[in-house]
Every structure is written in C-alpha cells, then in structure tokens.
Amino acid sequence: MKQQLVFEAPRRAMPPQHLADLDETARAAAVTELGLPAFRAKQLANQYYGRLIADPQQMTDLPAAVRDQVAEKLFPTLINPVREIQCDAGETRKTLWRAIDGSTFESVLMRYPQRNTVCISSQAGCGMACPFCATGQGGLQRNLTTAEILEQVRAASSTMRAEHFGRTAGTAGGGRLSNIVFMGMGEPLANYNRVLGAVRRIIAAPPNGFGISARSVTVSTVGLAPAIRKLADERLGVTLALSLHAPDDELRDTLVPVNNRWKVSEVLDAARYYADTTGRRVSIEYALIRDVNDQPWRADLLGKKLHGALGPLAHVNVIPLNPTPGSEWDASPKPAEREFVKRVRERGVSCTVRDTRGREIAAACGQLAAEG
C-alpha cells in the first residue's frame, strides 16, 4: 500500500520526563522540587553528559538516601536495546531500541580510522513516504522526545569509551564518539523542537551537554523549506544535509513526496539561506537509482542548479541505492555512477560517492525499518 505524506505525528502518550529533556534552568527547578540543594543539578548533569552515567545508583557523589528518588523522577529507563547486530568486521553496529510504549527505532554506530560516527533516529518511523526508503514505507509511529534522542548518543558514547575498539590512544578515532548524524529513522525537521533541544545538548560543553563540535553534527531533511530557514536562524553551525535525489520537480514529486509541497527551487533557496546565514557548506544527498535518476542529463541539470543556487557551498554525496525488501529499484552500475559524478563536477560542483556502511545488516541509508 502506498504511504501518504504525514507531517503531524499521531497523538500518543509521551514517556516520563528525563533529566536530558531539561535545560539548565529546568534542571535546577526539578532538583529543587525534589527537596535537594540546587548544586545537585550540576552534579547530575555532569554525571550524565560528562561521565555518561544514567543510573543514580552509580553516582557516588549523590547521597545514597536520595538515589532511588532521583532515579524515579529524573532518570526513568526510556529505551532498551532489543537486538544488536554487526558487520564490517565489527566496525558497524546496528541497535534496535524499544521505548516504554513499545515504539521501536534504530541507531547505527560506525567506526572509521579517523572518526567514530553514530547515526541516530529522531522519530519512530517516518511520515515522508519516500518510495525507495524502507523507513518511509513503514509509516510514522510518533516523534521521539529529546531524551530518547540523546539516549542514543549517550549509549554510543558510552560504548566507545568502554571498548576503545582496539584503536591506538590519541588517534582521532580512538575511544571517543566524534560525529553525530541525524540520518536514522524519521524527518528531523518534522520533530523540530525536540531535535533542536537534542542538538543544543549535544554541542554544549559539559555539564550542559556532550561537548561535540557543531561542525561534527549533521541534520538531514527531505526539504521542509520553512524549517530549514528556521534552523538557519538558530545559528548553531551544524551541517545541513538535503536529501534531494532528483533535480527536476517531475521526478522529485514521486521520489520525495514532500516536493509536492515545496518544489526544488524553493528548497534550494532555503538551502542557500542556510549556507549564507551559517557560513556552512550544504551536503546534497543523491541516492543513485538505475534508469530512474542516473541519466547524464539529470547529472548536468543537478550540477547546473546547484552551481547557480549554492556555488562552492554545495557538496554532492552520491549514494548507491541500498536494497530494501520488495523494492523494484536497484543501484546504478558503476560506469553510470562514475559518469554521473564526472558530469556534476564538470559543472563546478564538488561531488563524491559515499562510503556505504552496514548494507549487509540493513543499516545503510534508507534501510532502517526497526524490524524486531
């Protein structure tokens, strides 16, 4: 059955409040409400964001007499791992999470020689209905809370810190999570306020956040033009990744149904506004599909439009289409891929083929379906 475009998540009971849902002011108020001294708010935040501890029983600077109360009110268990599978010689790990209400979603931890990246979900499911994406074909269950998003980051950070994966101390990869990409399940800008809260805590220094550089955080979108402009005005300095997948409205209306609301020209105008406002280059994501969007003339048109709209502030990531169950489409052959990249570059636009990880375990771009 063809999925319909959904912007508003179904109304469902939301999880209990967690420390990670709260900003600095709200944390102080919550601690005071528990009858604890105000300085405990900073201690709790430092334990969570700095030491990556989410169990008050392990917080040695917290009096034992109040740990149960703090656990109940500020550290409920929001998500539990259901299954973890690995590939790429253990360098890629996909985790299926289940929330309190039974909603499921996935995150993917990827280790590279010079960086460690976690791909996180912002929604359980997705309402954008892109026909080549397993997540979009599954429909939208609900938005994730800020804390549910941040728990994926904390879990990945904790894993990296504990295991180090045998890397040499002092290398950029090492035992530290270095990059966050909002490219898992869901449309991040359709869950704007909670994603924004998560981004702010990801980039804030401890004890108010994980202290990851804004330049190492990527927020993807299928092209919600007003929200792109709104994100630009936040001036957070994160990277914007625009899932374009076609340079012409006729095809993009089908491949990316949100294009029926905001056309290619409107989305590229918003991307230009983002680049001008933040000074950051915009990543253009383009899943290359055999005989669908890989024609030489579409490469020429893509290069022409991006050069006109963004100039040197655009970089195209060509993504060989990853297989999904029941899909009638497959990836373009390598000669067509090379020709496509060459033609985009000839138009003066930076273009490379993405190093795809996790295809064997359905953890690559467009494959996340939270099947448990």
UniProtKB/Swiss-Prot annotation:
Amino acids binding S-adenosyl-L-methionine: G186, E187, S220, S243, L244, H245, N322
Covalent S-S links between cysteines: C119-C365
Cofactor note: Binds 1 [4Fe-4S] cluster. The cluster is coordinated with 3 cysteines and an exchangeable S-adenosyl-L-methionine.
Pfam (any one): Radical_SAM
Domain of life: Bacteria
Co-factor(s): [4Fe-4S] cluster
GO CC term, one of those recorded: cytoplasm
EC class: transferase
Record's catalysed reaction(s): adenosine(2503) in 23S rRNA + 2 reduced [2Fe-2S]-[ferredoxin] + 2 S-adenosyl-L-methionine = 2-methyladenosine(2503) in 23S rRNA + 5'-deoxyadenosine + L-methionine + 2 oxidized [2Fe-2S]-[ferredoxin] + S-adenosyl-L-homocysteine; adenosine(37) in tRNA + 2 reduced [2Fe-2S]-[ferredoxin] + 2 S-adenosyl-L-methionine = 2-methyladenosine(37) in tRNA + 5'-deoxyadenosine + L-methionine + 2 oxidized [2Fe-2S]-[ferredoxin] + S-adenosyl-L-homocysteine
EC number: 2.1.1.192
GO molecular function: 4 iron, 4 sulfur cluster binding; metal ion binding; rRNA (adenine(2503)-C2-)-methyltransferase activity; rRNA binding; tRNA (adenine(37)-C2)-methyltransferase activity; tRNA binding
Keywords: 4Fe-4S, Cytoplasm, Disulfide bond, Iron, Iron-sulfur, Metal-binding, Methyltransferase, rRNA processing, S-adenosyl-L-methionine, Transferase, tRNA processing
Stored InterPro entries: Aldolase_TIM (IPR013785), Methyltransferase_A (IPR040072), RNA_MTrfase_RlmN (IPR027492), rRNA_lsu_MTrfase_RlmN/Cfr (IPR004383), rSAM (IPR007197)
Subcellular location: Cytoplasm
Active site, per annotation: E106, C365
Domain Radical SAM core: 112-359
GO annotation, biological process: rRNA base methylation; tRNA methylation
Binding-site positions, [4Fe-4S] cluster: C126, C130, C133
Family, similarity comment: Belongs to the radical SAM superfamily. RlmN family.
UniProt xrefs under HAMAP family: RNA_methyltr_RlmN
PANTHER family: 23S RRNA METHYLTRANSFERASE, RADICAL SAM CORE DOMAIN-CONTAINING PROTEIN
Function: Specifically methylates position 2 of adenine 2503 in 23S rRNA and position 2 of adenine 37 in tRNAs.
Other noteworthy facts: Reaction proceeds by a ping-pong mechanism involving intermediate methylation of a conserved cysteine residue.
Name of protein: Probable dual-specificity RNA methyltransferase RlmN
Species annotation: Mycolicibacterium smegmatis (strain ATCC 700084 / mc(2)155)
